[in-house]
Structure formats: C-alpha cells, structure tokens
C-alpha cells in the first residue's frame, strides 16, 4: 500500500523540524520538506545583489531584500510542487514565514487537509492573520487567541523512540528565548518550584550577553 504524503513547512529554528520529520515517517508518512526553502538566503547572482543594494541605499526601499527572498522562495517551492505533483496533506508550523502566494499555490496541490499550528502568540507574528482562511484547520497555542476560526492545541511530544528511556532526573524542562512579556512569569514559577523542591531544567537564550539578563532570572535557570 502506498504511503500517504505530507508536506512539512516550518522554521529552521533549533532544527526541531528534523524530529518532527522523523516522527511523521515513524507514523507511516512520506515527508516532503520545504523547510530549507526559507532557512538561508543567498543572492542568486551579483547583479541581483547590486540591484537590491541600489534599491535599499539609493531608493530607500527597505523591503527590497524581503521581496527578493519571497520571490526566490516561491519559485523554489513551485519547482518542487511541479515535480512531485499532489500531496495528501500539508502541515505547517508558523505559516507566516511563507509568502501568501506560496501558501495559495500549495493549497491547490493538497488532496486532503492543510493544517497550521501557530506555536507563538498571534500578536507576535501578526502577518499570520491574513493566512488563516487558507487552512482547513488552524491550531493555536495561546488560549487568548481562540476564536471561531482557530482551534486550541498545547505542547506535543515525539513517540518514535520511547524504548529504554532513562528515568528523568528533573521534574520540568523548558527551553526558549528571553521575551520581556514572559520573563516575570518564568522567574516566578522557578521560585515556586524551588520552594516545592521541584527540579528544573530550564534554559533561556539571551543572545550575545547572557550575563546582562541574569537579574531577571533565579540561579536555577540556565542562561545561554
């Protein structure tokens, strides 16, 4: 029996897509990935670079590079879809990273459901609002974003390698970036966990100067 095909599109961040791709294969899917299409940008030629710089510096066109990137991304994905034809499903995480026209093109090549999961708050990447109608189902992480057009979904886990897992030594695990609108909540929880005797394995990415952000977090949180 032929395997169902699923197109996967999401950010390159921390290479979580590799785990998701492995898990989809574990559940019997053939995975078509378009993650690399948005991961790195390179000018296709010297003339394209010079033209873009001219638009930016002389014409003060701040969106010149973004438009070129969107154009190249679209063509790369169109070439891929024309080659493979139709897919059964499409799964996106943070579809705002893909141009609207690209999503419309993919929509025409999906046989069944096209789904997006917005694992960040809708306010953080507001461009996603204009893309909701392109999906059969649109899942959100933040309960504050629930509407008639969205469905709630929480964290997920990978079940392709659950054999012989060591017993965890920590009670809670978290990794994420420092964001001013959530640092207090994370710090308060870590203090509460310390009072309860819970062991945390928390890691906060703080860019090039982690020491500066130590004042925001207790010592039971690792900054990097």
Located regions from the model:
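Internal alpha/beta domain cores that form substrate/cofactor-binding pockets in large enzymes
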Residues: 65-72, 100-102, 110
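Active-site proximal beta-strand in glycosyltransferases
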Residues: 94, 106-121, 138-139
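Nucleotide-sugar donor-binding catalytic core of glycosyltransferases
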Residues: 2-52, 69-75, 84, 119, ...
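Surface-exposed amphipathic alpha-helices with a cationic face
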Residues: 103-111, 190-194
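Short N-terminal targeting/anchoring amphipathic segment
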Residues: 80-97
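Catalytic alpha-helical scaffold of carbohydrate-active enzymes acting on polysaccharides/glycoconjugates
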Residues: 78-82, 103-105, 124
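An aromatic- and histidine-rich active-site surface loop
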Residues: 14, 92-105, 182
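Short, structured active-site "lid" loops
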Residues: 51-65
């Amino acid at each position: 029996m032929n395997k169902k095909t699923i197109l996967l599109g999401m950010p390159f961040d921390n290479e979580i897509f590799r785990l998701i791709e492995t898990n989809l294969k574990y559940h019997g899917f053939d995975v078509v990935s378009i993650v690399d299409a948005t991961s790195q940008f390179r000018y296709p030629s010297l003339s394209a670079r010079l033209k873009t710089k001219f638009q930016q510096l002389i014409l003060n066109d701040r969106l010149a590079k973004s438009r070129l990137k969107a154009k190249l991304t679209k063509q790369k994905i169109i070439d891929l879809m024309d080659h493979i034809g139709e897919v059964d499903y499409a799964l996106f995480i943070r579809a705002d990273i893909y141009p609207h026209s690209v999503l419309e093109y993919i929509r025409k090549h999906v046989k069944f459901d096209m789904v997006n999961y917005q694992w960040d708050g809708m306010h953080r990447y507001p461009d996603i609002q204009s893309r909701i109608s392109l999906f059969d189902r649109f899942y959100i992480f933040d309960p504050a974003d629930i509407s008639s057009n969205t469905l709630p979904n929480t964290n997920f886990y990978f079940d392709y390698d659950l054999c012989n897992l060591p017993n965890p030594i920590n009670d809670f695990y978290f990794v994420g970036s420092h964001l001013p609108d959530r640092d207090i909540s994370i710090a308060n929880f870590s203090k509460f966990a310390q009072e309860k005797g819970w062991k945390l394995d928390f890691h906060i990415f703080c860019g090039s100067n982690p020491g500066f952000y130590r004042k925001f977090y207790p010592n039971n949180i690792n900054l990097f």
